[in-house]
Each structure stands twice: as C-alpha cells, then as structure tokens.
Amino acid sequence: MIKLKVKKGDEVVVITGKHKGKKGKILKVFPEDSKVIVSGVNLVKKHTKPNQMSEGGIITKELPIHISNIAHIDPKTGNPTKVAFKFLEDGSKVRVAKKSGEIIGKEGK
C-alpha cells in the first residue's frame, strides 16, 4: 500500500485511458487497492434483478480507476499538477500544487 496524495472531494482530471481529459470530484478512495471513484468517469450500466427491497432495472454507476491515471487540478490555473507536502508556520502539514504553489483542498479555502 502506498501513501495517497488524494482525498475525498478533491478536483482531479483523468490523464490516461479512454476517459482522458474528463474532470470530476473524488467520491471515494480505496487506499488498499490504490484506486478512486471519480464522479462522471468510468460509468457502466448494471442490470439488477428485482427483489423485496427494490425493483429491477438498469442503473448507471461509477467504477474505480487507478490513481496513476489521475492528476490534481491546480486551483490557480485549472491545469493538471503534481502534489507536494509542505509545513506551514503553525506546524500544520498541507498539500501544495507544485506548479503554482497554491494550497490544495479544504485547507486552502
């Protein structure tokens, strides 16, 4: 298991694969598999049988994609960027966009 630099709610863009260029927010992170679910990316249709709890039909849902296929969106420029960690004066650790130096995530809002 590797250290992930992504969190739920981060804005990312797909950089490789059939969904290249699509942007979305991270809905769920699977650290043990190094995968994430991104809203609106890697959509599949699943046929479900009816049961006592719900009726059957076709549902559309997102499947996980590997974290190597995504990149953070720079909050300043809107372009893909790498992420670094930085310590602030108060001692807190934050994620920073390498291209612009802007803080990524809730810490920067």
Swiss-Prot record:
GO CC field: ribonucleoprotein complex; ribosome
Gene Ontology molecular function: any one: structural constituent of ribosome
GO BP: translation
Keyword RNA-binding carried by entry: yes
Pfam families, sorted: KOW, ribosomal_L24
Disulfide bonds: none
UniProt KW keywords: Ribonucleoprotein, Ribosomal protein, RNA-binding, rRNA-binding
InterPro entries, alphabetized: KOW (IPR005824), Rib_uL2_dom2 (IPR014722), Ribosomal_uL24 (IPR003256), Ribosomal_uL24_CS (IPR005825), Ribosomal_uL24_KOW (IPR041988), Translation_prot_SH3-like_sf (IPR008991)
Family: Belongs to the universal ribosomal protein uL24 family.
UniProt function note: One of two assembly initiator proteins, it binds directly to the 5'-end of the 23S rRNA, where it nucleates assembly of the 50S subunit.
Subunit description: Part of the 50S ribosomal subunit.
NCBIfam families: rplX_bact (TIGR01079)
Protein name per the record: Large ribosomal subunit protein uL24
Organism of provenance: Rickettsia felis (strain ATCC VR-1525 / URRWXCal2)
Record gene name: rplX
